[in-house]
Amino acid sequence: MSKKQKIAIVGATGAVGEELLNVLDELDFPVESILPLASAKSVGSEVEFKGKAYKVKELTENVFKENPIDIAFFSAGGSVSEKYAKFAVESGAVVIDNTSHFRMEKDVPLVVPECNPEDIKDWKKTGIIANPNCSTIQMVQVLKPLNDAFNLKRVDVSTYQAASGAGKEGMQELVEAMQSFFAFKLDEFEPQTFPYTLALNLIPQIDVFMDNDYTKEELKMVNETQKILHKNLEVSATCVRVPVLRSHSEAITMHFEKEIDVKKAKEILKKAPSVIVIDDPKNKKYPMPLMTSDTNETYVGRIRADVYDKKILHLWCVADQIRVGAATNAVRIAQKWLELKNK
């Protein structure tokens, strides 16, 4: 039985921080204690874990010295990780970082446990393990087993990303915009989190535009997929924010070196870890955001061959990005790290 771990959660009052507590409980992770950390404005508030209340403390440079911990989950933004992760590492903890700050650093493993758990062994180089972007995680969980079988050479993906990808503020803004719509005042609504009103709308921009006219979010999917799969894979992404509260959806087109047997591809995906196939289009059965919200799996459907090219496969992929795309993946990393540590 694994030794119980002292856990710190940086960003404990945010959407991912709150979900981390739920997932740690559900996956029965061996927890001795919880140290919830946040900014000064949240100090004094409480979070609950397994029926016990823990007071939120302020994140400072000395808090990890004063409160020794084993694992620190960081989910409070890249600038916070940049400033404070080193203090957790110096105190002897492993940092599992949910932000984008460390992902592409050479010596920091970028891990999806279903795809590249072997990379966790490199954590000692920096004391940090990076959690990939939410939209990347669900995609590579599907790509990995198919790549192993058919040798993937290119991926084209269009995402349909929920408001909660922008945190609690994103969810709240969508709800308020819909309330404005039902009050016949949507034209008066002023968005703060998104560049435009999201209610009844689609926004083909997530994060800032780069010099090549791709957004930062789109390039994350390109670069992170290549790093996780250890393959110089061609990836092109178009990321769109949609008026859905929770769960990201993706339409994925995969180009392979070999001809695809769709029946075999479905069987491979049915056996893939953390993947659930819902694919019965004649009976209108396929994954959707509402059915996948608050779950820990990646759902796949609409699996079909290309009409023109036998080396191309199309599918539809949906997952709760707060869980699969952040909290659940982070806890699964911690589980694998603990297994490795105990060997």
From Swiss-Prot:
GO terms for biological process: 'de novo' L-methionine biosynthetic process; diaminopimelate biosynthetic process; isoleucine biosynthetic process; lysine biosynthetic process via diaminopimelate; threonine biosynthetic process. Pathway: Amino-acid biosynthesis; L-lysine biosynthesis via DAP pathway; (S)-tetrahydrodipicolinate from L-aspartate: step 2/4; Amino-acid biosynthesis; L-methionine biosynthesis via de novo pathway; L-homoserine from L-aspartate: step 2/3; Amino-acid biosynthesis; L-threonine biosynthesis; L-threonine from L-aspartate: step 2/5. SUPFAM superfamilies: Glyceraldehyde-3-phosphate dehydrogenase-like, C-terminal domain, NAD(P)-binding Rossmann-fold domains. InterPro entries: Asp-semialdehyde_DH_CS, Asp_semialdehyde_DH, Asp_semialdehyde_DH_beta, NAD(P)-bd_dom_sf, Semialdehyde_DH_NAD-bd, Semialdhyde_DH_dimer_dom. Its EC number is 1.2.1.11. One of its GO terms (molecular function) is protein dimerization activity. Signal peptide: none annotated. Pfam families: Semialdhyde_dh, Semialdhyde_dhC. Phosphate binds at residues 103, 220. It comes from the Bacteria. The active site is at residues 134, 248. Keywords: Amino-acid biosynthesis, Diaminopimelate biosynthesis, Lysine biosynthesis, Methionine biosynthesis, NADP, Oxidoreductase, Threonine biosynthesis. Substrate binds at residues 161, 241. It catalyses: L-aspartate 4-semialdehyde + phosphate + NADP(+) = 4-phospho-L-aspartate + NADPH + H(+). CDD domains: ASADH_C_bac_euk_like, VcASADH2_like_N. The keyword Amino-acid biosynthesis applies. NADP(+) binds at residues 13-16, 41-42, 164-165, 321. The keyword Amino-acid biosynthesis applies. Catalyzes the NADPH-dependent formation of L-aspartate-semialdehyde (L-ASA) by the reductive dephosphorylation of L-aspartyl-4-phosphate. Homodimer. Belongs to the aspartate-semialdehyde dehydrogenase family. This is Aspartate-semialdehyde dehydrogenase.
